[in-house]
């Protein structure tokens, strides 16, 4: 099963400094049919104005992955971590028993991110944060694991039964991905257009995938795609 979730039909909010679209219920957007996909709870598509951002606020018991599409995001937290994550790179925060953090666009241009929340395998534990560059050339024509709850993956660690993956797919190129049909995959092109199986998925649309052992993704335009493989 592959279900297209068009960008135009997503929930969202415009706060002036923040233009947000929500693939799943979040804040003031509630849809009982879109409370998550497996243990994937949140996928927000955020545009953050220059010199603006999220002031310090708390989180607990959530794995929070930030994929930077354009610009850069600067993170500070109550553990003493500070980091600037640029376009194409990824940061992960395991909120654990509780943490406060802020995220600001300190650049002179709009920053665009995907923020993905995944429910952890166990509650509590010490919070942690990390970031890692993932050059787009290294994921050309194939999926690379960006964050993972599985030992042995060369990726940022998360405490969840899930993987976050990324690929760049050129127009005319096809990539085949093996899946567990009992799990839940969710794919979003950051840019470009792809066919997921026979379903056309445009930039910032979502594709909810389950009950399939393989899926073929074909580039219609050059595309940058992010996928979560969730329990």
Language model features: what each stretch is:
Residues 1-231:
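Jelly-roll (double-stranded beta-helix
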């Amino acid at each position: 099963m592959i279900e297209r979730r068009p960008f135009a039909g997503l929930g969202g909010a415009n706060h002036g400094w923040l233009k947000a679209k929500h693939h799943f219920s979040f804040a003031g957007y509630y849809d009982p049919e879109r409370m998550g996909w497996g243990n994937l709870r949140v996928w927000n598509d955020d545009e953050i104005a220059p010199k603006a951002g999220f002031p310090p606020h708390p989180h607990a018991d959530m794995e929070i992955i930030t994929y930077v599409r354009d610009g850069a995001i600067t993170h500070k937290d109550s553990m003493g971590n500070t980091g600037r994550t640029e376009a194409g790179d990824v940061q992960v925060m395991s909120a654990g028993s509780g943490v406060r953090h802020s995220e600001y666009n300190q650049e002179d241009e709009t920053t665009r991110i995907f923020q993905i929340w995944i429910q952890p395998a166990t509650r509590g534990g010490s919070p942690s944060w990390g970031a890692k560059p993932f050059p787009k050339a290294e994921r050309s024509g194939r999926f690379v694991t960006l964050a993972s709850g599985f030992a042995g993956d060369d990726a940022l660690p998360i405490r969840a039964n899930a993987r976050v993956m990324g690929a760049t797919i050129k127009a005319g190129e096809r990539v085949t991905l093996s899946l567990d049909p009992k799990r839940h995959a969710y794919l979003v092109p950051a840019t470009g257009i792809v066919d997921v199986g026979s379903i056309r998925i445009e930039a910032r649309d979502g594709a909810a995938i389950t009950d399939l052992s393989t899926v073929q993704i074909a580039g219609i335009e050059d595309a940058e795609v992010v996928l979560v493989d969730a329990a």
